[in-house]
From Swiss-Prot:
Origin organism lineage: Eukaryota, Viridiplantae, Streptophyta, Embryophyta, Tracheophyta
This protein's record includes keyword Nucleotide-binding: yes
UniProt keyword terms in alphabetical order: ATP-binding, Nucleotide-binding, Transferase, Ubl conjugation pathway
Pathway: Protein modification; protein ubiquitination
Its job: Accepts the ubiquitin from the E1 complex and catalyzes its covalent attachment to other proteins.
Protein name: Ubiquitin-conjugating enzyme E2 27
EC numbers: 2.3.2.23
Length: 192
């Protein structure tokens, strides 16, 4: 059974330290089983200046089972699926320990952005590009960061969609649920 008191304590710890690390965790629901993590892109990487959101689902066995985490912000990285946001990181699988926390998992994901492991990829296409044409990889990763993870670009997307006649809250929700993809958000808004 989920230890909700531990999750609450971890959320409080993250809130206390968010200014220094930039890492945040917020509940998506009242029952604390769905959370959103936010990490800043590491300095000196193609992800610098970006803010990346991670969907977190707490399993019934937490803290003895790892939280399920995946990027909702699109990211170009060998160990992260460019399609689904799935993350290839050992501590989110067989190397999880109850001594680890949500914050340590998010710090580890942030470190993964700094140090890709292309020989153990989640996304083979990105890993191949990383190994065969590193400069193109860096350019693509920067472009994705600019397009999907920069706040200014988010505000520009919101503005464009609001100008089409959709409500601000509705637009922000559609963009978030689309991982920052403006075209997919527009499709969702039009089909709603």
């Amino acid at each position: 059974m989920i230890d909700f008191s531990r999750i609450q304590k971890e959320l409080q710890d993250c809130e206390r330290n968010q200014d220094s690390s930039g890492i945040r965790v917020c509940p998506k629901s009242d029952n604390l089983t769905r959370l959103t993590g936010t990490i800043p892109g590491p300095i000196g990487t193609p992800y610098e200046g970006g803010t990346f959101q991670i969907d977190i689902t707490m399993p019934d066995g937490y803290p003895f089972e790892p939280p399920k985490m995946q990027f909702s912000t699109k990211v170009w990285h060998p160990n992260i699926s460019s399609q689904s946001g799935a993350i290839c990181l050992d501590i989110l699988k067989d190397q999880w320990s109850p001594a680890l926390t949500l914050k340590t998992a998010l710090v580890s994901i942030q470190a993964l952005l700094s140090a890709p492991e292309p020989k153990d990829p989640q996304d083979a296409v990105v890993a191949e590009q990383y190994m065969k044409n590193y400069q193109v990889f860096v350019s693509t990763a920067r472009y994705w960061t600019e397009t999907f993870a920069k706040k200014s670009s988010l505000e520009e997307k919101v503005k464009r969609l609001v100008e089409m006649g959709f409500g601000d809250a509705q637009v922000r929700s559609a963009i978030e649920s689309s991982g920052g993809d403006e075209n997919l958000a527009l499709e969702k808004l039009c089909s709603a």
